[in-house]
Amino acid sequence: MGRAVSVAACALNQWALDFEGNAERILRSISIAKSKGARYRLGPELEICGYGCADHYYESDTLLHSFQVLAKLLESPATQDIICDVGMPLMHRNVRYNCRVIFLNKKILLIRPKISLANAGNYRELRWFTPWNKARHVEEYLLPRIIQEVTGQDTVPFGDAVLATKDTCLGTEICEELWAPNSPHIEMGLDGVEIFTNSSGSHHVLRKAHTRVDLVNSATAKNGGIYILSNQKGCDGDRLYYDGCAMISMNGETVAQGSQFSLDDVEVLVATLDLEDVRSYRAEISSRNLAASKVNPFPRIKVNFALSCSDDLSVPICVPIQWRHHSPEEEICLGPACWLWDYLRRSKQAGFLLPLSGGIDSSATACIVYSMCRQVCLAVKNGNSEVLADARKIVHDETYIPEDPQEFCKRVFTTCYMASENSSQDTRNRAKLLAEQIGSYHINLNIDAAVKAIVGIFSMVTGRTPRFSVYGGSRRENLALQNVQARVRMVPAYLFAQLTLWTRGMPGGLLVLGSANVDESLRGYLTKYDCSSADINPIGGISKTDLKNFIQYCIENFQLTALRSIMAAPPTAELEPLMDGQVSQTDEADMGMTYAELSIYGKLRKIAKAGPYSMFCKLINLWKEICTPREVASKVKHFFRMYSVNRHKMTTLTPSYHAENYSPDDNRFDLRPFLYNTTWSWQFRCIDNQVSHLEKKEGISVAEDTD
């Protein structure tokens, strides 16, 4: 009858410029799709070269090697008798485009350039590509000789068209086009397109997955149709983790769901769906049919191929399922862990070293590494031969099988407690107990000799000896002595990362992990070039509030009882002298604000685009039950002073896993100056004027604010 179509969506762990590996994963996904009965296979955005090539897109080599891979795909027997939809950059009339190349049996059917480019947040597509602005227009694209020799075609259609097979009609969207207000699927659906495809390069952000799922389902809820979404997965070379979530939806309901976090390099979803369900769904939507009668038609590329078989009554049809979302704590547990695994295996290092202080942040980082070890053991148990091969390379043992997370952790994870005279026995014990429970190779060392040597050099040169404030020193002296301790810790961290495995008779070196959270980075509550200066930081995009919830999750799910005392202890840097052996310094007292307040400031500054005055205006309403306008003004001023004074620290911040949309990451997400006029005189005067107006209105008499 020709009504049951079988289609495949893929999530591939591609790597920028890894043309060899990318081609292998694409071919494997096509073979899997065919083995499951699919007649159409959709891959992620720019899958041939990997999405994160950045300025390598300018290079002609990137285009050349992409065409070489395309030729390999066209020639492969695996790509025969299935419509293959792959992504790559190419140049048309001296303009670079982000494209889908759709082919069947060594013939290119259509090259579809991206219409709406992603250019916000971490995305910079307009830097490298140009959008195709010729709606419903097709031109002839002259193929390079390397492709002509395979296909026998000189030119192929290039532009905004749809494919008309023998049994249905397919239309293409590329990532951002689904998120755009005028998504192409709207007009395509009105023009009779029944299957919409979307190849994405969408990265993970906490609590974002439901938005993507809702967009896909809503795309066909009003207009009917089948929607296929493929996405990249894994770390392809930078701060982002692409979180898969391949899915297939029909008439507003999910029928197939892929994993969001997985160590599988290739994941293929196949669904068989009844086209008559789409047609009957549309038939009763009179508003849709009236709109369809007025739509301008898309150019149709006729394809002598069917996505269904002639006798399909016995083919089982997929039914709707309920999408299973991860909690934020599960996302923190799994996303950064998968990112760390990709970084470790692709950097060809032998593990990680973490300065473990016994506080929440470094403990959360340790738990993420432990989660990675659990994921590796689970993947090997489930038969993932690639993970097993990677694990053996990392530990330099061709017969090794990671079965126990603690045992694997001992091989690949070193933790180091770096004590000073200001460290408490409590934090030392907490770090030791947590290391024992997760299985890391743990080291205790003391940095006092190094600190005294450096301060001694200063005293010898200047004739002056700085003192902590509790001993009569000035604020400058106090801060300098704290920073010396913090900075000294960076040097042994890298030394032990290079040589710890050597002392254990094991080959390789370790990557140093940092543990500064997103709130502390925003406030600048960290020492430049201290042990937060590391190779990578898995928690740098995560708030303190979420980290606390994650720690509680680990207590409940991993039975890490050592975390209970860590959760109960107030966060402290332990850089000032102890009082009667007890900690006298706390982070929130040092910062002059709470972590909860910092999260609010961060979201207003970045997500709500609020400067000092706008933030004040929003907070006087948000906090009207707990703060007077003058108190709100004081808090806002203090935040912006500290933010601007410390912004320079972001320029050298350790590359961090991107998890929050209010991240202050200076690399490309949050582009700001790092030399500010920290008085904010005009802005703060506007706040003061508004405070005076509000107090006058309320009949409050307050002395002039000199803050």
Swiss-Prot record:
| UniProt-annotated catalytic positions | E45 (proton acceptor), K114 (for glutaminase activity), C175 (nucleophile), S357
Residues involved in ATP binding: P355, L356, S357, G358, G359, I360, D361, S362
Q: Which residues form the CN hydrolase domain?
A: 5-275
For this protein, the Enzyme Commission number is 6.3.5.1
Which is an annotated Pfam family here?
Answer: CN_hydrolase
Keyword ATP-binding carried by entry: yes
Alphabetized UniProt keyword annotations: ATP-binding, Ligase, NAD, Nucleotide-binding
Q: Which GO terms describe its molecular function?
A: ATP binding; glutaminase activity; NAD+ synthase (glutamine-hydrolyzing) activity
Gene Ontology cellular-component annotations: cytoplasm
Q: Which reaction does it catalyse?
A: deamido-NAD(+) + L-glutamine + ATP + H2O = L-glutamate + AMP + diphosphate + NAD(+) + H(+)
Name the residues that span the membrane: none
Chain intervals for the UniProt region annotation (Ligase):
325-706
Alphabetically, which GO biological process terms does the record hold? 'de novo' NAD biosynthetic process from L-tryptophan; NAD biosynthetic process
Biochemical pathway: Cofactor biosynthesis; NAD(+) biosynthesis; NAD(+) from deamido-NAD(+) (L-Gln route): step 1/1
InterPro entries hit by this protein = C-N_Hydrolase (IPR003010), C-N_Hydrolase_sf (IPR036526), Gln-dep_NAD_synthase (IPR014445), NAD/GMP_synthase (IPR022310), NAD_synthase (IPR003694), Rossmann-like_a/b/a_fold (IPR014729)
State the source organism's domain of life: Eukaryota
Q: How does it assemble?
A: Homohexamer.
User: What family does the entry list?
Assistant: In the C-terminal section; belongs to the NAD synthetase family.
Functionally, this protein is described as follows: Catalyzes the final step of the nicotinamide adenine dinucleotide (NAD) de novo synthesis pathway, the ATP-dependent amidation of deamido-NAD using L-glutamine as a nitrogen source.
The name on file for this protein is Glutamine-dependent NAD(+) synthetase
- This chain's source organism reads Gallus gallus
Gene symbol of the encoding locus = NADSYN1
